[in-house]
Amino acid sequence: MALRGVYAQLLNRGPGLRVFRSWSSATAQTEKGEKTQSRSAKPSRPEFDWRDPLLLEEQLTADEILIRDTFRTYCQERLMPRILLANRNEVFHREIISEMGELGMLGPTIQGYSCAGVSSVAYGLLARELERVDSGYRSAMSVQSSLVMYPIYAYGSEEQKQKYLPRLAKGELLGCFGLTEPNHGSDPSGMETRARHNPSSRSYILSGSKTWITNSPVADLLIVWARCEDSCIRGFLLEKGMRGLSTPRIEGKFSLRASSTGMIIMDDVEVPEENVLPGVSGLAGPFGCLNNARYGITWGVLGAAEFCLHTARQYTLDRIQFGVPLAKNQLIQKKLADMLTEITLGLHACLQLGRLKDQDKAAPEMVSLLKRNNCGKALDIARQARDMLGGNGISDEYHVIRHVMNLESVNTYEGTHDIHALILGRAITGIQAFVAGK
């Protein structure tokens, strides 16, 4: 379904959304009128809006703004009310995937197969709005779009695309991506999961385990990477219910609690030959998927950082100590200025990367640069905001501590902060330093 059409439908669903539309229009008209009066009263002078310091809005297309505003409304009105208890109780709401599917937000950059076919920037804007609410929700969407739908689209057969992509796009199926193993995180080349070919049954027998897999306990479709007898790594499509396949949940997380995380355990799981992804072999396959997912993360974490900035700003304006607002303190203003600076620079870098991505000019190192920078800066901002809220900063009702906990994970997964430093170091020097002495 076209996202423009979805936007029109969403706005017509209820009075609350019509109020949002009216408020947005009225606000825009009021601001326009104020600016007009200001220009007539004195010579024209560029105005600074701290909410959009370098005019990101002016660099987006009308469609991108429309898509973002649609999803922002959904996130704030449908997801934000759920997240407090979901995080407290460590509950993943499966229905949000179906809801996002109805909005056309799953696999949105894919052309055809019931997908929206929007720009990479539009996808980034979606990730930003989703992670403004919670990193766990963004993780679920990111896995579905970049780690499940993308490899089927990029490496799958036409039969696989027709069979799975439309149902994944609608949220009827939920997928997961199995690469990380108990003994192999940053070094997937040491993969121990094995796939033995059985010519007589035209199938592969998979044995091994994967861990820290987002969505695995509730997944209908599992993309698993395994080493074949020729030592080549290939991707396999496993379906829920296959004999020998289990996906136990990992309990007791203090991060991404609104996301379902688990293992994939394969005890001689028989997978038909037609379930092998034919278009890729070797680590280029999973790395290509991760590159797409990391791009979404670069946008998403800034949404979380923006939430923390806005919360800290309002709190320090409202909180009176020693007879004045905390925001009157020079140290507080410096912290807010530092936060705003890093978020602004990060967003404009994301915009440039998105445009390059749509032109097929985005090198993996570019993504590593922003994944490393934006995740690290977002975590720093969340920690600062937590501190600025004082004792209230550890209360989940203010949401900032939840973002701190979540960003600790996001700074680690899909390439740790240090691994991305080594990727960039190799690009700078021409020398790989992943293993000392090699």
From Swiss-Prot:
Pathway: Amino-acid metabolism; lysine degradation; Amino-acid metabolism; tryptophan metabolism
Reactions catalysed: glutaryl-CoA + oxidized [electron-transfer flavoprotein] + 2 H(+) = (2E)-butenoyl-CoA + reduced [electron-transfer flavoprotein] + CO2
Gene Ontology cellular component annotations, sorted alphabetically: mitochondrial matrix
UniProt cofactor(s): FAD
Protein's name according to its UniProt entry: Glutaryl-CoA dehydrogenase, mitochondrial
The encoding gene: GCDH
Main localisation: mitochondrion
Protein's GO biological process: fatty acid beta-oxidation using acyl-CoA dehydrogenase; fatty-acyl-CoA biosynthetic process; L-tryptophan metabolic process
Family per similarity comment: Belongs to the acyl-CoA dehydrogenase family.
